[in-house]
């Protein structure tokens, strides 16, 4: 199976394979088979629209984890200029599962913080599969307080299965690090915009997710636990993950309907991994618009609005 396609995308993968074969034949024999390639490409696009027009919550959860999906550093490269990464929590070490630093958006200095996963095995291990340890969240907190001091807006990118649950993380007080971030972010006197770009997993996501504006990409998820974890608790088997995903309401559209998410950002046909530049352009446009709106508010109004937003959850 083509690793660029999930199992429910297999009919699309088959068509794309035929298109590639025709292109190779045309290149080798100087044949003009453009009409047939165009016909198959149109058929592929129609099939993609049909499949993606009726995705289940579980299929969206799997898209959110797609191995080719753009990560935080990919979006930084496409959206921002003059990015200067900052390292370390000034207490223990630097956690590569959280990246952050100063950059410019439309010439405006901003602080960027986000989860980062890896692509290859070695990089996945170095990034701890996008699961931060306490030092990652303390690094994020340090950068957020720096942003407040220098009056820079904070833009966070959420993409994690959750905070790392290992013994070493618990020994360094993982829960305290997350709780402290929630406390600090609720009071920061600078605009905060959070965007879920993949998985939004539990407290590991929320630790950089307290904000004035919450965006979700169309095929991202946000939940207190993974569908597999929920299924294992309720049904004693992870095979019920699809049922759990549907019951939990983890998708962007469901969360928008509940008033938790402010904006669902559309993705290119087939998902952000099909056209990362287009996905980044959509995010950039929303960030620019939202930042301009938030910058019009004074600090008292900003904090009061943030407080009311948080207190409205669950009502």
Curated annotation (Swiss-Prot):
GO terms for biological process: fatty acid biosynthetic process; malonyl-CoA biosynthetic process. The keyword Manganese does not apply. Gene3D superfamilies: 2-enoyl-CoA Hydratase, Chain A, domain 1 (3.90.226.10). PROSITE patterns: COA_CT_CTER. It catalyses: N(6)-carboxybiotinyl-L-lysyl-[protein] + acetyl-CoA = N(6)-biotinyl-L-lysyl-[protein] + malonyl-CoA. GO terms for cellular component: acetyl-CoA carboxylase complex. Residues 39-293 form the CoA carboxyltransferase C-terminal domain. Pathway: Lipid metabolism; malonyl-CoA biosynthesis; malonyl-CoA from acetyl-CoA: step 1/1. Component of the acetyl coenzyme A carboxylase (ACC) complex. First, biotin carboxylase catalyzes the carboxylation of biotin on its carrier protein (BCCP) and then the CO(2) group is transferred by the carboxyltransferase to acetyl-CoA to form malonyl-CoA. This is Acetyl-coenzyme A carboxylase carboxyl transferase subunit alpha. It comes from Pseudomonas fluorescens (strain ATCC BAA-477 / NRRL B-23932 / Pf-5).
């Amino acid at each position: 199976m083509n690793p660029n396609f999930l199992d429910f995308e297999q009919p699309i993968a088959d068509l794309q394979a035929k298109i590639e074969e025709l292109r190779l034949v045309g290149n080798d024999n100087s044949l003009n088979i453009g009409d047939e390639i165009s016909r198959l490409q149109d058929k592929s696009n129609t099939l993609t629209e049909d499949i993606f027009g009726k995705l289940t919550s579980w299929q969206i959860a799997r898209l959110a984890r797609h191995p080719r999906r753009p990560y935080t550093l990919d979006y930084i490269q496409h959206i921002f200029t003059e990015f200067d990464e900052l390292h370390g929590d000034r207490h223990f070490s630097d956690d590569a599962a959280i990246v952050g630093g100063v950059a410019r958006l439309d010439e405006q200095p901003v602080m960027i913080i986000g989860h980062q996963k890896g692509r290859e095995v070695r990089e996945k291990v170095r990034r701890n599969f996008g699961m931060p340890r306490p030092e990652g969240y303390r690094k994020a907190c340090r950068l957020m307080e720096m942003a407040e001091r220098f009056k820079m807006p904070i833009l966070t990118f959420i993409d994690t299965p959750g905070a790392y649950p290992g013994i070493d993380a618990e020994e360094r007080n993982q829960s305290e690090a997350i709780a402290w971030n929630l406390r600090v972010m609720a009071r920061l006197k600078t605009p905060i915009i959070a965007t879920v770009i993949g998985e939004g997993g539990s407290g590991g996501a929320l630790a950089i997710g307290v904000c004035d504006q919450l965006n979700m990409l169309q095929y991202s998820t946000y939940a207190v636990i993974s569908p597999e974890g929920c299924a294992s608790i309720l049904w004693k088997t992870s095979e019920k993950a699809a049922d759990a995903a549907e019951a939990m309401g983890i998708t962007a559209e469901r969360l928008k309907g509940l008033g938790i998410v402010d904006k669902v950002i559309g993705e290119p046909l087939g998902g952000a991994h099909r056209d990362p530049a287009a996905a980044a352009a959509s995010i950039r446009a929303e960030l620019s618009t939202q930042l301009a709106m938030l910058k019009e508010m004074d600090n008292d109004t900003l904090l009061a609005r943030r407080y009311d937003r948080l207190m409205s959850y669950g009502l």
